[in-house]
A protein has these predicted regions:
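N-terminal type II signal-anchor transmembrane helix
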Residues: 2-41
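A structural signal for short, hydrophobic/glycine-enriched beta-strand patches
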Residues: 27-190
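A transmembrane-helix-recognition feature enriched in membrane-embedded lipid enzymes
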Residues: 191-215
Length: 215
């Protein structure tokens, strides 16, 4: 019940903020850009033991991680496994090939000259799962510094969740939103998809801030 109340408050707040920004023509662009940048993580990057991709970062994550590898920020990449779900298994039963997203990303990395790619043998369905399993995996492998590549619109909330999961575990984790993400924080209001992402992700971020004010 409390989460639902916080979610409603967050949604109303975001909707009003967007409406006000659009209505106030003289400062409209600055306000809209500020709302977009509100979603983006601002962690400082440092040389890392490994770069890990969010499950939903897709090609944008592969491109960003490849750039970091070529800039010698890290020398290896990891991504979560993508085992078939019940729908995929039914397609397999009917003789239709399953396109494993993790395998596709590995192929893309190899094509871009990145050979040190590891698949984390854990199936995750969201950021909370990612944060829990990533913290455990890093501890198991002795990784102390990690860069986690997410989509831009999801990066700030991801940074908060990851910080809670890794606190006290001796892991320094930085979150980076891929510059190749479809979401543009400086022009999101120019497309229906951008507006939808801004409202949904702002609602989730504000709800997280209300539930975990000291993250």
């Amino acid at each position: 019940m409390r989460l639902r109340k916080y979610t409603v408050v967050a949604l109303v707040t975001v909707t009003l903020a967007v409406a006000c920004a659009i209505a106030m023509e003289p400062v409209r662009t600055s306000l809209l850009r500020a709302l977009g940048r509100f979603l983006v993580a601002t962690d400082r990057l440092q040389r890392a033991d490994v770069i890990v991709l969010a499950v939903d970062s897709d090609g944008a994550g592969v491109l960003e991680a490849t750039d970091l590898i070529h800039e010698h920020i890290a020398n290896r990449v990891a991504l979560f496994a993508d085992p078939p779900d019940s729908v995929d298994r039914e397609f397999l039963r009917r003789g239709v090939a399953y396109h494993n997203a993790a395998a596709v990303s590995v192929e893309q990395f190899h094509a871009l000259g990145v050979d040190a790619v590891e698949v984390i043998p854990r199936a995750v369905t969201g950021t909370t799962d990612e944060s829990r399993d990533l913290a455990a995996w890093c501890s198991e492998h002795g990784y102390a510094t990690v860069i986690f590549v997410s989509t831009l619109d999801h990066s700030r909330r991801t940074a908060r969740i990851m910080a809670r999961a890794t606190r006290g575990r001796g892991i320094q984790l930085s979150v980076l939103g891929s510059r190749y993400s479809n979401f543009d924080p400086n022009a999101w209001w120019k497309s229906r998809g951008g507006v939808r992402v801004e409202i949904v992700e702002s609602e989730k971020l504000l709800a997280d801030m209300l539930l975990h004010p000291f993250s």
